[in-house]
């Protein structure tokens, strides 16, 4: 067993894939009891049955807090914000670490779940938290592989061990993005195409007209227009013209591809946390755009590596 580091400013993300051969409460109990013995709080944000079983093992210690297990948001930015809020509500703030247990929960979108688990290591890096994620082994065929890739630590019958398959969040996200390119919709005729765009007002009017006939609700359409507007304005300001905008609408999903001829940004972590939090100052556009869509990716516009195409996807 590897002893836990005492670094008070490191988010420690621990994965445990459950199986029928092990009693979860018996295995997890000692892991949490050591935290209580050190005077550090434990928060159980699990489904009722799991929270009850763990609380029974831990006893009536006043440092054990059971909170409702909210369904995980499908969109990674929303899921990350919810997790940060949960942690910040209970973080002691006096130098002690918080010990959080979440899951198991249903994962409707395996790709979004994988992105969220990877991004937790980036977004929460400075918080002094030990976060134990419980995962049901039957959720997907490769749950164990996903746990190893997204959790630097694993809880096993032998104790806490480094994950042999852990990958840096940026590397994992790059591979996930590349696997989905090009989007199959791009082989079809776009619903809307605007070449060499030079007037954002014309774009907004066209988007509002087309999206009014789409499968999106009025609020979702407004959010999508906001995201497209932010990315297009960024391309016009920082890229190299011409800027082209193409939109595909189907009953299931919508895709907008914004292309310019400047250099493409290669950091998939950009925009997953506001750089400064001041909406009156620039630099918040990508953060806003990510929160308004189901997926935002950037890649070179062609095989030569020239140009940049940002793809925004919303599931209807």
Segments the model singles out, each with a brief description of its role:
Residues 1-197, 306, 316:
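Non-catalytic sensory/regulatory segments that transmit input signals in bacterial signaling proteins
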Residues 28, 116, 228, 282-285:
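Amphipathic coiled-coil/heptad-repeat helices and related helical stalk/stem segments
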Residues 40, 129, 216, 241, ...:
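Short glycine/serine/threonine/alanine-rich loop segments
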Residues 114, 201-205, 287:
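Short, well-ordered alpha-helical segments
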Residues 182-184, 236-316:
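Conserved beta-strand-loop-beta-strand hairpin that lines the nucleotide-binding pocket
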Residues 186-190, 222-233, 237-239, 273:
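Coiled-coil dimerization/phosphotransfer module
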Residues 197, 201-232:
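Conserved short strand/loop->alpha-helix "switch" segment adjacent to the catalytic nucleotide/phosphoryl-transfer site
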């Amino acid at each position: 067993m590897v002893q836990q580091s005492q670094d008070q400013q490191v988010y420690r993300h621990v994965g445990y894939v459950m199986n029928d051969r092990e009693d979860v409460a018996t295995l997890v109990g000692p892991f949490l009891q050591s935290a209580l013995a050190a005077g550090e709080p434990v928060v159980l944000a699990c489904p009722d049955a799991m929270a009850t079983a763990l609380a029974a093992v831990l006893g009536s210690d006043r440092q054990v807090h059971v909170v409702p297990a909210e369904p995980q948001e499908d969109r990674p930015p929303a899921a990350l914000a919810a997790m940060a809020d949960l942690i910040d509500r209970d973080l002691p703030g006096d130098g002690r670490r918080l010990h959080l247990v979440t899951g198991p929960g249903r994962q409707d979108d395996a790709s979004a779940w994988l992105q969220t688990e990877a991004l937790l290591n980036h977004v929460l890096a400075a918080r002094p938290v030990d976060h134990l994620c419980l995962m049901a082994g039957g959720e997907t065929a490769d749950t164990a592989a996903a746990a190893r890739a997204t959790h630097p630590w694993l809880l096993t019958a032998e104790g806490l061990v480094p994950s042999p398959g852990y990958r840096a969040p940026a590397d994992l996200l790059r591979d996930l993005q590349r696997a989905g390119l090009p989007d199959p919709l791009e082989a079809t005729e776009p619903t809307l195409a605007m070449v060499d765009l030079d007037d954002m007002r014309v774009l907004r009017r066209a988007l509002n007209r087309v999206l009014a006939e789409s499968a999106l609700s009025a609020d979702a359409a407004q959010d999508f227009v906001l995201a497209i507007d932010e990315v297009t304005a960024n391309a016009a300001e920082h890229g190299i013209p011409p800027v082209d905008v193409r939109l595909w609408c189907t009953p299931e999903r919508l895709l907008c591809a914004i292309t310019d001829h400047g250099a493409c940004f290669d950091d998939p972590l950009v925009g997953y946390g506001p750089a400064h939090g001041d909406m009156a100052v620039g630099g918040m556009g990508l953060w806003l755009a990510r929160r308004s869509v189901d997926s935002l990716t950037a890649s070179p516009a062609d095989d030569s590596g020239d140009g940049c195409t940002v793809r925004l996807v919303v599931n209807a």
